[in-house]
Amino acid sequence: MSSTRIDTETLRRLPKAVLHDHLDGGLRPATVVELARSVGHTLPTTDPDELAAWYYEAANSGDLVRYIATFEHTLAVMQNREGLLRAAEEYVLDLAADGVVYGEVRYAPELNTRGGLSMREVVETVQEGLATGMAKAAAAGTPVRVGTLLCGMRMFDRVREAADLAVAFRDAGVVGFDIAGAEDGFPPADHLDAFEHLRRENVPFTIHAGEAHGLPSIHQALQVCGAQRIGHGVRITDDIPDLAAGKLGRLAAWVRDRRIALEMCPTSNLQTGAATSIAEHPITALKDLGFRVTLNTDNRLVSGTTMTREMSLLVEQAGWSVEDLRTVTVNALKSAFVPFDERTALIEDVVLPAYASVL
């Protein structure tokens, strides 16, 4: 591990990239309160600070199913154009304020149709809000490129419909696809037709795997479904019996040697019980073993976090250096679902010069 360290204030200004971040898990607490009032939805509290604390405490159950259940209140205020436009616009502005220069936001449009919008209308509305946010961020001198990953919910039957929308909107801001939701009992291969369709249409996709479920979910996501990245993937360590020795099993070696990005989310993993502490989170050992690990927030409201906070935690509790942070930032951009020239420009023109200035 390199020796150069960094203070938090400098860290806030460094360019960042986030690949795994859910739109409905990242609303501002004040926005949830205001939108809930406008649609008549009852919240646990109407005080924004208390609501933020409620989310964080409710998510700290150590159980993925309970963690997911906290989304009911954010989803309740994202069922019309007003809520979707505001959530999307503020999403971009919040990333820009956090120093993020590239982000991929994911959401499942089927979860936003209770107010009468079609899935297509949901996608159109979110893209409109994201475009507004990017224009405002650029005008403020903090440009950020945000691409969309459409999600299918693995426990429901509209995954193929979401995949069709990813194909339809791939030239209109949608850069890829994912399936989300409870892993146990809902293997990704249940939706193989959707993944085969995406592959035929040359649309990249990631799959949530290796979080609540173990190696079989990672193997199936990669070798059966053909995922280009893995969402979370912390359980890949089950195929590395001795992390210190670094002897890899066949699946772990495949992931490392083929440079398959792991979208790791330390704070979220602590909340769902997928990891025990920041200091012992597998991201550090996997980074040191040469895996293409990336650092992510997952759900900024639910986890009470930002990219700056995630980086700070790794610096303070896992001994990370600025070189380590640069590595995972470059890793994320190398594995982003946008064209090669865009990724290269962000790495060479934005990220590397900024990190060089503090080394």
Swiss-Prot record:
Chain residues that bind substrate: 22, 24, 181
Q: Spell out the residues of the site Important for catalytic activity.
A: 232
Q: Which reaction does it catalyse?
A: adenosine + H2O + H(+) = inosine + NH4(+); 2'-deoxyadenosine + H2O + H(+) = 2'-deoxyinosine + NH4(+)
Tell me the keywords, alphabetical order: Hydrolase, Metal-binding, Nucleotide metabolism, Zinc
* GO CC list: cytosol
What superkingdom does the record give?
Answer: Bacteria
Q: Which residues bind Zn(2+)?
A: 20, 22, 208, 298
Q: Which InterPro entries match?
A: A_deaminase, A_deaminase_dom, Ado/ade_deaminase, Metal_Hydrolase
What Enzyme Commission number(s) appear in the record? 3.5.4.4
Q: Which GO terms describe its molecular function?
A: 2'-deoxyadenosine deaminase activity; adenosine deaminase activity; zinc ion binding
Q: What class of enzyme is it?
A: hydrolase
The cofactor required is: Zn(2+)
SUPFAM superfamilies of this UniProt entry? Metallo-dependent hydrolases
Q: Which terms does the UniProt entry file under GO BP?
A: adenosine catabolic process; hypoxanthine salvage; inosine biosynthetic process; nucleotide metabolic process; purine ribonucleoside monophosphate biosynthetic process
Cofactor binding remark = Binds 1 zinc ion per subunit.
Catalytic residues as annotated in Swiss-Prot or TrEMBL? 211
Q: What family is reported?
A: Belongs to the metallo-dependent hydrolases superfamily. Adenosine and AMP deaminases family. Adenosine deaminase subfamily.
Function comment = Catalyzes the hydrolytic deamination of adenosine and 2-deoxyadenosine.
Q: What is this protein called?
A: Adenosine deaminase 2
- The protein's organism comes out as Streptomyces coelicolor (strain ATCC BAA-471 / A3(2) / M145)
- Gene, per the UniProt record: add2
